[in-house]
Protein backbone atom coordinates (compact mmCIF):
# COMPACT_ATOMS: atom_id res chain seq x y z
CA UNK A 1 0.00 0.00 0.00
CA UNK A 2 1.55 3.27 -1.07
CA UNK A 3 0.15 6.63 -0.10
CA UNK A 4 -0.17 9.49 -2.55
CA UNK A 5 0.32 13.22 -1.90
CA UNK A 6 -3.49 13.51 -1.94
CA UNK A 7 -3.69 10.93 0.87
CA UNK A 8 -1.23 12.96 2.94
CA UNK A 9 -3.31 16.09 2.33
CA UNK A 10 -6.48 14.31 3.44
CA UNK A 11 -4.81 12.88 6.56
CA UNK A 12 -3.38 16.30 7.44
CA UNK A 13 -6.82 17.85 6.99
CA UNK A 14 -8.47 15.24 9.23
CA UNK A 15 -5.76 15.79 11.85
CA UNK A 16 -6.13 19.56 11.43
CA UNK A 17 -2.46 19.94 10.55
CA UNK A 18 -1.04 22.56 8.24
CA UNK A 19 1.88 20.96 6.42
CA UNK A 20 4.24 22.83 4.14
CA UNK A 21 5.02 21.13 0.81
CA UNK A 22 8.37 19.99 2.24
CA UNK A 23 6.76 18.57 5.38
CA UNK A 24 4.11 16.86 3.28
CA UNK A 25 6.76 15.23 1.07
CA UNK A 26 8.79 14.13 4.10
CA UNK A 27 5.65 12.68 5.71
CA UNK A 28 4.81 10.84 2.48
CA UNK A 29 8.30 9.29 2.38
CA UNK A 30 8.21 8.30 6.06
CA UNK A 31 4.73 6.77 5.95
CA UNK A 32 5.43 4.87 2.73
CA UNK A 33 8.63 3.55 4.33
CA UNK A 34 6.63 2.41 7.34
CA UNK A 35 4.04 0.68 5.14
CA UNK A 36 6.87 -0.97 3.22
CA UNK A 37 8.20 -2.49 6.44
CA UNK A 38 4.71 -3.70 7.36
CA UNK A 39 4.29 -5.32 3.93
CA UNK A 40 7.63 -7.14 4.34
CA UNK A 41 6.57 -8.41 7.76
CA UNK A 42 3.20 -9.58 6.43
CA UNK A 43 4.96 -11.48 3.62
CA UNK A 44 6.85 -13.69 6.10
CA UNK A 45 5.32 -17.16 6.48
CA UNK A 46 4.81 -17.68 10.22
CA UNK A 47 2.58 -20.77 10.07
CA UNK A 48 3.85 -23.44 12.42
CA UNK A 49 5.97 -21.03 14.48
CA UNK A 50 5.02 -20.82 18.15
CA UNK A 51 4.52 -17.31 19.55
CA UNK A 52 7.22 -15.99 21.88
CA UNK A 53 6.46 -14.64 25.32
CA UNK A 54 9.62 -12.53 25.03
CA UNK A 55 11.96 -12.10 22.03
CA UNK A 56 15.11 -12.49 24.15
CA UNK A 57 13.95 -16.01 25.07
CA UNK A 58 15.11 -17.11 21.59
CA UNK A 59 18.77 -16.31 22.19
CA UNK A 60 19.16 -17.12 25.89
CA UNK A 61 17.33 -18.65 28.80
CA UNK A 62 15.45 -15.81 30.46
CA UNK A 63 13.44 -15.96 33.65
CA UNK A 64 10.49 -13.70 32.90
CA UNK A 65 9.17 -11.58 35.71
CA UNK A 66 5.48 -12.16 35.15
CA UNK A 67 3.00 -11.83 37.96
CA UNK A 68 -0.67 -12.44 38.47
CA UNK A 69 -2.78 -9.55 37.18
CA UNK A 70 -4.60 -8.39 40.31
CA UNK A 71 -5.88 -5.01 41.47
CA UNK A 72 -3.41 -3.59 43.97
CA UNK A 73 -5.35 -0.46 44.94
CA UNK A 74 -8.98 -0.01 45.97
CA UNK A 75 -11.54 1.33 43.51
CA UNK A 76 -11.66 5.10 44.03
CA UNK A 77 -13.78 6.03 41.02
CA UNK A 78 -16.31 8.04 43.01
CA UNK A 79 -13.62 9.98 44.88
CA UNK A 80 -11.75 10.71 41.65
CA UNK A 81 -14.91 11.88 39.88
CA UNK A 82 -16.07 14.29 42.60
CA UNK A 83 -14.11 17.16 41.06
CA UNK A 84 -15.37 16.48 37.51
CA UNK A 85 -17.80 19.04 36.10
CA UNK A 86 -20.03 16.33 34.62
CA UNK A 87 -20.31 12.58 35.25
CA UNK A 88 -22.92 10.10 34.07
CA UNK A 89 -23.13 6.41 35.04
CA UNK A 90 -19.52 6.43 36.24
CA UNK A 91 -18.14 8.07 33.08
CA UNK A 92 -16.67 11.54 32.60
CA UNK A 93 -18.75 13.68 30.25
CA UNK A 94 -16.69 15.88 27.94
CA UNK A 95 -17.68 18.30 25.19
CA UNK A 96 -17.74 17.04 21.63
CA UNK A 97 -14.45 17.97 19.91
CA UNK A 98 -14.82 16.24 16.52
CA UNK A 99 -17.41 17.44 14.04
Curated annotation (Swiss-Prot):
Listed PANTHER family: GLUTAMYL-TRNA(GLN) AMIDOTRANSFERASE SUBUNIT C, MITOCHONDRIAL
Function: Allows the formation of correctly charged Asn-tRNA(Asn) or Gln-tRNA(Gln) through the transamidation of misacylated Asp-tRNA(Asn) or Glu-tRNA(Gln) in organisms which lack either or both of asparaginyl-tRNA or glutaminyl-tRNA synthetases. The reaction takes place in the presence of glutamine and ATP through an activated phospho-Asp-tRNA(Asn) or phospho-Glu-tRNA(Gln).
GO molecular function term, any single one: ATP binding
EC numbers, comma separated: 6.3.5.-
Assembly, per entry: Heterotrimer of A, B and C subunits.
Pfam family, one: GatC
Family note: Belongs to the GatC family.
Protein name (record): Aspartyl/glutamyl-tRNA(Asn/Gln) amidotransferase subunit C
Catalysed transformations (reactions): L-glutamyl-tRNA(Gln) + L-glutamine + ATP + H2O = L-glutaminyl-tRNA(Gln) + L-glutamate + ADP + phosphate + H(+); L-aspartyl-tRNA(Asn) + L-glutamine + ATP + H2O = L-asparaginyl-tRNA(Asn) + L-glutamate + ADP + phosphate + 2 H(+)
UniProt source species: Acidovorax ebreus (strain TPSY)
Gene Ontology biological process terms in this record: glutaminyl-tRNAGln biosynthesis via transamidation; regulation of translational fidelity; translation
Statement: the UniProt record of this protein carries the keyword Endoplasmic reticulum: no
Domain of life (superkingdom): Bacteria
Entry keywords, A to Z: ATP-binding, Ligase, Nucleotide-binding, Protein biosynthesis
Amino acid sequence: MALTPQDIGRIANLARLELSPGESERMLTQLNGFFGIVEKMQAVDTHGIAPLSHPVAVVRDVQLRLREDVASEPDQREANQRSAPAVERGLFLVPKVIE
